[in-house]
Amino acid sequence: MRIATWNLEGKWTPRHHWLIRSLRADLLLLTEVLDKVAIPGLNIHFTEGEMQPGRRWAAIATNAPLRPLPDPHGATALAEVEGFRVASSILPWRNSGGAPPWNGHDQGSRTAAAVTSIRTAGPLVWGGDWNHELTGRLYAGSTEGRESILGGLDHLGLSASTDASPHRLPGARSIDHVAIPAFWTVASVERVSAIVDSVELSDHDAYFVEVD
């Protein structure tokens, strides 16, 4: 099974569709998704809430049957896919502010609050734009936020296969992640550039995890 995540930055063109198809993913954990996005052959479920008109916080797309579930948090989509729960999330960035869907006085406390809600939903696969490096130096994330995410993963029995994946920026590590059960066997983890034909499709690259 191949699981991918990509922050679309609220854009959708034929090039975006091409890159999505090139990932050959069975399960897509998308963030900053226009609600007009449709991918032939894939079922898709969006968050109820919008970042701004026409742009949803997150979505889940899959070639398998999908049963939408209520959002456990305003910036997280949740669905049941082939009997297990899948979540796709945006977690707070440094200057996200405290307006809904965030709750807290800074990035760390807002992340902790979001993770608590997501953890309660019990996803078996969880990913998206977490705005935190999980290993190495913190450029985008916070210490408290990282600790909350890692604690949530441990509680759920998950491991972020992307924790050491490179960011597009030299020397930095990914803030986009895919977490799966710690006992699953990972065949490969790859970053896929979102710069196609010298055109930046998004300010985030895509990542996929291949599971045996």
Where are these regions (language model features)?
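N-terminal, active-site-proximal structural segment of metallo-dependent hydrolase catalytic domains
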Residues: 1-42, 50-52
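Ligand-binding grooves and catalytic loops that recognize ribose/phosphate and carbohydrate rings
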Residues: 34-75
